[in-house]
Amino acid sequence: MRFSIVVAAYNVERYIGECLESLKSQSFGDFECIVVNDCSQDGTLDAIDRAIAGDGRFTVLTLERNSGLSAARNAGMAAAAGEFIMFLDGDDYYAPEALERLDARITADNLDMLYFGAASFYESRKLRREHYENQEVRESVGGVHCGPDMYVLMERTKAFRPSACLYTVRKALLDTCGLRFLDGILHEDVLFQMQLIPHPQRVAFLNEPLYQRRMREGSIMTTRPTMRNVHGLAVTAQRMQEWLAAHAGEYSREFCEAYAWRTSDTREVAARYLREIDEADVAAYRKGLSVEELAAFDLHVLGLWRSMGHVYDEYETSHAYRIGHALIAIPQKIRKLVELPQAKPGE
C-alpha cells in the first residue's frame, strides 16, 4: 500500500464529509485512510460513518476521551500500514489529483519525503481580512536534497511551512527515528517537523496547491490565543534549543543558523501572543511551573515579551500613531518584531 492518510477529527460534523469525499474521489486509489475520532461531542462520528460506508479503504478509531491532536495523530500512525504517511485535518481536503501527483514525484526521484503546497480558503470576508495567509505564493526549490539542506533552502526562500499536513514521509523513517507528536501541547506540528528534518536523505518540494486549507471560526488558527498556545510554543522552542545544542557539531553552519533562527522565531511568536492574554492568566500559568520551567519561561518568553512591550508602548504614544497613520508609518524596529524576518542562512 502506497499511502496511509491519518485524519484527525474533533467536532467537525459540518466538514468531515467533504474531507473524506475528497479522498474517495482521488485519481490514485492505492491508499488507506485512518480516521481518528477524538471523542467528538457532536455528530462527527455519524457523519464519518455515512461518508465511508462500503469503502474498505477507510478505518475508524474512536478515542475514549478527548485527548488532543497529538494523541489522535499518534493513534493513527500506530495503525498505519502504508509506505508513506500523510496527515489531513478533518475540516480540510485534498485536490482530486493530490495522491497521483505525489506518487509520481516520489517514484521519479526515489524520495524519502516530499513537501507540497496548499491553498487557503475562507468561510467569510471577516476571516479573510483578519487571518489572510498567502499559501499559494511560495518560491519553488528544485532538485533533490537531504533533509537539512532542503530545510536551509526552504527557509532562505521563505517556502518553509511548519505544518504536518504539507508533506508526506516514509513511515519506516518515522518508526526508525521513533518520532511521535508530543502529547499535551498545541502547535505540535512545529516540534515534530523540526525533529524530523535531520533524518531523510532524499527530499523534494512539489510546489502545487494539493492541500485545501479551510479558515473557519473556532479553529486553533482563528481563535484568540491563550496560555495553551504560549505553552506549546515555549516548550517547542526549548526542545529545539536543547537539540541544537547537543547536535550542532554534526551539521553545517548554514543549517545551524537556520535552525537557530526558527527556534528564536518560535519564541517571538509566543511572546507576541502574551500581549493578547490577561495578566492574571499569565500569573496563574507561571505559578504552576517548576523552578526550572519558570526560569526558562521568564528568560526566553516573558523577558522577550517585556522588551517587545516597550517598543509597542513607544509606538502607541508616537505622533504617527495618534494621527491615524498606523499602517503607513510603522517604525522599522517594530517591523522587525512583528514581521517574520527572512532567514538568510550562510549569508
Give residue spans per PLM region.
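A conserved acidic beta->alpha catalytic loop
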Residues: 22, 37-46, 65, 89
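Acidic helix N-cap motif at the loop->helix transition within catalytic regions
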Residues: 17, 31, 42-51, 57, ...
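Catalytic core of nucleotide-sugar-dependent glycosyltransferases
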Residues: 208-217, 223-251, 265-294
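Short, well-formed alpha-helical segments that are part of the catalytic scaffolds
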Residues: 12-25
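Short aromatic/hydrophobic "clamp" motif used to bind/position activated sugar donors
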Residues: 85
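Cell-envelope/extracellular polymer assembly enzymes that use nucleotide-activated donors
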Residues: 1-4, 32, 191
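Donor-binding/catalytic cores of nucleotide-activated saccharide
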Residues: 90-204, 213-230, 249
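Membrane-interface aromatic/basic loop that binds lipid-linked glycans or pyrophosphate carriers
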Residues: 111, 271-347
